[in-house]
Structures are given as C-alpha cells and as structure tokens.
Amino acid sequence: MKNRTFSVFYRKYEQILEKEILSSEIPEHIAVIMDGNRRYAGQLGKARIFGHAMGAEVTEQVIEWCYEIGVKQLTLYAFSTENFQRSEEEVGGLFNLINEKFLKLHTDKRTYEKEMQVRVIGDRTKLPAYLNESIDRIEKATEHHRKFSLNVAIAYGGRQDIMQAVRDIATCVSSGKLSLEDVNESLISKHLYPAPGVPVPNVDLIIRTGGDERISNFLPWQANGSECATYFCAPFWPEFRKIDLLRSVRVYQARKEEKKREHSYRISKVKNFLRVGKYENKSEDLGQLLPLKKQGVS
C-alpha cells in the first residue's frame, strides 16, 4: 500500500515538473556523463558488468525522454580513453554490450520513426573490428536523419580530440590546403570528432550522475565555449529517473533566466550612467560592471 501511494505521488510530481519545464526553453544539446555503474553493482554484490548492463537499460529510457521533451542532440559518454586501463575482461564486456546496443538501434523501428541520426565520436582506431563494423552500419543507416541526433563517445578524451584536430589543421596548413588566415573557431570545430562531418554543436547542459562534481575531460571545446549549465546528481546511472532529467532541465532554465536578469541589470546601469553624463569623473565606474555582484544577480 505504501509503495503504491508513493508511486502515485511520484508520477504526479513528475507530471507537474514536466509541465513546468515544457513552458520554458528546452536545451537543444544535452551531454551526459553516465557514472556509477560499477558502484551500483558493488552495492548489490554483483559483477561490474551487471552494473553496466543495468545502466544500458537506463540509457535507452533517457534517449526516449530526451526525444519526448524536445531535445535535439544527446551526447553520451560511453567509454573514455582512461577506461582502457580497466581489466581486459571488463573492457571486453563493455565493448560487447555497446555492440549489442548498436545492433539493436539498427533494427529498432523507433530509430527510423524518430529520424534519429547516430554517430560515434572518439578514436575508433582503438576499437575492435566487430564494434567498428556495427558503428559503420548504424551510421550509414541513419546518416540522412536530422530530427534527433545521438552522439556516442567511445575511446574519447577531450584533450586528445583537440590535439588531433590541431594536428590535422597543421598538416593542411603545411601542405598548402589551408592558410593560417583560414584558422578560426568554426574550422577547429569541423576538425573535432567525428571529423569529417557535421561538427558536434556547443553543449547547453551537462549532466553527471554518481555524486562526483567534475566534467572528466568531456567535450571541453563544446562545453566551455557555450558556458553550458551543469547538473550533478547523487543517483548512480542505473538509478537515474525521468525526474532527475527534468530537474536538470529546470537548472538549465533557471541559469538562463539568471543570465537574462544579469544582462538587463548591466544594461540599465550603463543607461543610467550615460543619462547622468559625468563621463570623465565616473569612467572608472564602467569597469565595475564586469565583476558586478548584486543580490539575485551572479
């Protein structure tokens, strides 16, 4: 009886929260650091691969939830370059699990009903042949889809991504294909994974589960460039709920509103300054607008 009551309350709260966030701007690009699979398994006395398998089930749900609320791009941190330091058994089990999910995406009618494009970002030279074959198959099957984009980061490291882009651009410059004047932010973005191709856009919101409050070398170019919102939550990835996703979107929306208020406040201060007309004696006041701190504005 108690569990049923809680379930009804939970569902009602979820509906209220979803209605609230749908009345405001939805982030176009969400990136997720899916942390806590191994600790989740450890708490239950299970093998690590059990935690990864449970996490993979949640991943399928999160793709659905993001699509439902209007997110356009979802990037998932599935396997970092540092993860290669784990045991051969665990790495092999992870690759098998990821491969199964790509095969399922390829045959799942929802992939095509949603017009979902699937791409992998990362150093694919480090991946086994069977996994690369599955990646090629799903990328080819969905390459013309544009309604929803799923980017899966495998063998990915943010610093390594920037380094390979810089090396590629340097090679183009030295061979005469590019000049130094051609190098700008847009060009660098085009040489990041999954180069060649449409670059992964700036991130609006990064979510990390499992309690750690760090970004872990994930999409540094796309995240810092857009000053994206971040949402850290305690549940391990297999415990992640739709309510957690909706709460993260609410944090993004609150941050957007805060930035709008700050911008309006600064503009009003500048207008007031110009209205007074004491430019020479008050010029130093303009510099105070940059580090401005006011109650309700940060």
Swiss-Prot record:
EC numbers for this chain: 2.5.1.89
Catalytic activity of the protein: geranylgeranyl diphosphate + 7 isopentenyl diphosphate = tri-trans,hepta-cis-undecaprenyl diphosphate + 7 diphosphate
Binding site for Mg(2+): 35
Entry keyword Cell cycle: no
Active-site residues, as the UniProt record annotates them: 35, 83
Cofactor remark from the record: Binds 2 magnesium ions per subunit.
Gene Ontology molecular-function annotations: ditrans,polycis-polyprenyl diphosphate synthase [(2E,6E)-farnesyl diphosphate specific] activity; magnesium ion binding
Quaternary structure note: Homodimer.
Function: Catalyzes the sequential condensation of isopentenyl diphosphate (IPP) with geranylgeranyl diphosphate (GGPP) to yield (2Z,6Z,10Z,14Z,18Z,22Z,26Z,30E,34E,38E)-undecaprenyl diphosphate (tritrans,heptacis-UPP). It is probably the precursor of glycosyl carrier lipids.
Name of this protein: Tritrans,polycis-undecaprenyl-diphosphate synthase (geranylgeranyl-diphosphate specific)
